[in-house]
UniProtKB/Swiss-Prot annotation:
GO terms for biological process: ribosomal small subunit assembly; translation. Transmembrane segments: none annotated. It is found in: Plastid, Chloroplast. This is Small ribosomal subunit protein uS19c. It comes from Pinus thunbergii. Its main location: plastid. One of its GO terms (molecular function) is structural constituent of ribosome. The lineage of its organism: Eukaryota, Viridiplantae, Streptophyta, Embryophyta, Tracheophyta.
Amino acid sequence: MARSLKKNPFVANHSLRKIKNLNIKEEKKIIVTWSRASVIVPAMIGHTIAVHNGREHLPIYVTDRMVDHKLGEFAPTLLFQGHARNDKKSRR
């Protein structure tokens, strides 16, 4: 179920505060975050945000097409190794 339009989108306060400070100073630094549930807002455009995927932080450059998506959508947590070949040993 989608979030109510009466409410504002969820953005972690510490991330938003860091981005606003960087926008005021006009700096471009990598912002490290564990908040995968945060929604990308227009203030984040042009910044690089390192999102945690459970093992490491993946740097993601935010563009205008990413607005209203969540940060976790761009940092996959599972690594697909591929299907097993026809292995005669594993079958009975």
